[in-house]
A protein has these predicted regions:
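Long, intrinsically disordered, low-complexity segments
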Residues: 10-13, 68, 77, 105-108, ...
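Conserved, well-structured interaction surfaces
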Residues: 35-36, 43-49, 75-156, 178-182, ...
Length: 523
């Protein structure tokens, strides 16, 4: 009878409780709900095609500098000549990495626009009814969108502004090419408008007010290249907003702690990509740089790829007393018994019947060696702690902006305003970073030494190309393997001029948008 009564009651009172409908009243009322809404826009930075991708944004910022070279070892890493072309600045407008960099940046802007469109669908189009939380969410999405535009600006210069939110029909969106200065002004205006609405709390991995300060400082640091006029005072002011903002950012007492597998919420990191070896993949730096024999040394489940390394000239910028030198592996690779591992290259014509002792050397003798005799050449990068037992992806978060960079940025601004030499305040800022590395404090400092210090501190973190351009050292490319091609033929030095400071608009972008884009000069 009880069961029958329940059935009868259910049939006469058909008012089901709804759990899944999203309305303006029941959604977007907590930070957690908005985090779910915007998660996909942040997720653009993870994965194999994300920010640290070996064939995209990161490679464009690093492979093209003195920090990274990828020698072809036998047949490994030739990749149709792309790594060599990137290193030697002989890329063209359909080079793989250049195509991928564009897709990454504008894939990010599109996802941010989707977030903003969803907010309008949930909250309605009457903005007068939006509450503080809604405006904070909009500001976060727009700041992230400005970040992706900044990446595109830095790489390609004269690009498009992707801010279409209201228009649902993508075919009706008018694509237009803007000048570098116009893109710069768009990003600046977006950030200045968003900053008052952003949360002023420290939320690890999110676009908050201090992160926007860091992005704006980066924009102003490179303003002369982007817009034709330096903005050193503005850059310094926004660095101060972080330094004096009470956010709790400090230098970690141990440099290598910043990059450990447990670096989440490290007080030095201002804005990271939050990686996870299982659920948020994408940090593969240990995998691409370590030699195959390092699999057993680090207990990795798959062999590393024996690819990117640094140049001897860059490695030699580190004093032996510099604790940051520990981010590079040079020397014998030892087995569990303390003996040097012997590696069989498979090429009987080299070494001892094809076998070479596993001794990593700083010097890279050839950028292309079909014999594989260069198998152990080039210092390997272990800043991001290789974790025992992992496979392809690491758990270490990747810092895009960190406190040490902010200190060095402000010091640079002060030096630029002081004829290129450090005053007392600039010295004090740089020495915070320099002495943390176990070195004696500077008593004087010029811009060339500051550039070297930035390199030592920020190696492989995606800043080197930008820095070399700002210091006038990029186009001239005076590092190893820049004077001869892979076959030993001399490269015409007249090819290297300022046009390489920006990459070409990818061929596929121009083909898909006929009549819209004018190719960047020199391509």
């Amino acid at each position: 009878m009880a069961a029958a009564m329940c059935f009868t009651t259910a049939c006469t009172d058909l008012k089901p409780e709804v759990y899944g409908d999203v309305t303006a009243d029941n959604y977007f009322t907590t930070p957690e709900q908005f985090s779910n809404l915007i998660a996909n826009a942040y997720a653009q930075m993870i994965g194999e095609y994300g920010y640290v991708y070996r064939e995209g944004y990161w490679s464009m910022q690093e492979y093209t500098t003195d920090e990274v070279v990828i020698p072809t070892r036998g047949t490994d890493w030739y990749d149709n000549g792309v790594p060599i072309a990137m290193h030697q600045h002989t890329w063209v407008y359909n080079t793989r990495d250049i195509n991928n960099g564009w897709s990454f940046a504008y894939g990010g802007t599109a996802k941010c626009n989707t977030v903003l469109r969803n907010i309008r669908q949930i909250k309605g189009t009457d903005e007068s009814l939006y509450d503080e939380a809604t405006w904070a969410g909009i500001a976060e999405a727009k700041t992230l969108r400005a970040f992706y535009h900044f990446l595109a600006l830095d790489l390609y210069g004269n690009v498009t502004i992707d801010s279409a939110v209201v228009e649902e029909d993508a075919t009706k969106i008018q694509i237009k090419q803007y000048t570098s200065k116009e893109i710069y002004e768009f990003i600046e205006a977006e950030l200045l408008a968003c900053i008052p609405q952003l949360t002023n709390d420290v939320r690890y991995g999110s676009m908050t007010r201090p992160v926007a300060y860091a992005l704006l400082a980066k924009l102003y640091l490179n303003a002369e290249r982007y817009a034709g006029e330096p903005q050193w005072e503005k850059c310094a002011a926004y660095c101060d907003s972080i330094i004096n903002g009470g956010y709790g950012y400090v230098l970690d007492g141990n440099y290598m702690n910043v990059f450990k597998t447990t670096n989440t919420n490290n007080p030095e990191i201002i804005f990271p990509i939050v990686f996870d070896a299982k659920y948020a993949k994408g940090n593969m730096l240990h995998l691409i740089t370590l030699h195959y024999v390092h699999q057993d040394v680090y207990g990795l489940t798959t062999p590393p790829w024996n690819g990117p390394c640094t140049l001897e000239s860059f490695y030699n910028k580190y004093d032996d007393k510099d604790k940051r030198k520990a981010q590079w592996l040079v020397g014998a690779v030892l087995d569990a018994n303390g003996d040097t591992i012997i590696y069989d290259t498979g090429n009987k014509a080299i070494g001892d019947n094809g076998k070479l002792p596993a001794v990593i050397t700083a010097k890279v003798t050839k950028i292309l060696d079909a014999t594989k005799a260069n198998s152990f050449e080039g210092a390997r990068f272990v800043k991001f702690e290789p974790e025992y037992g992992i496979e392809h992806h690491a758990n270490s978060d990747f810092p895009i902006y960190r406190y040490a960079d902010i200190l060095l940025m402000k010091a640079e601004c002060l030096m630029r305003l002081n004829g290129g030499m450090a005053n007392g305040e600039a010295l004090a800022l740089v020495n915070q970073v320099h002495t943390r590395a176990g070195l004696e404090p500077y008593t004087s400092l010029d811009l060339d030494e500051l550039l070297d210090e930035r390199g030592r501190e920020l190696a492989w973190e995606g800043h080197r190309r930008q820095d070399l351009i700002r210091f006038g050292k990029y186009a001239e490319g005076k590092w190893e393997f820049m004077d001869k091609d892979e076959n030993g033929a001399k490269i015409d030095p007249s090819f290297r001029d300022e046009h390489v400071n920006i990459f070409p608009i990818p061929e596929w972008v121009m083909t898909a948008n006929p009549g819209v884009y004018t190719q960047n000069p020199g391509y």
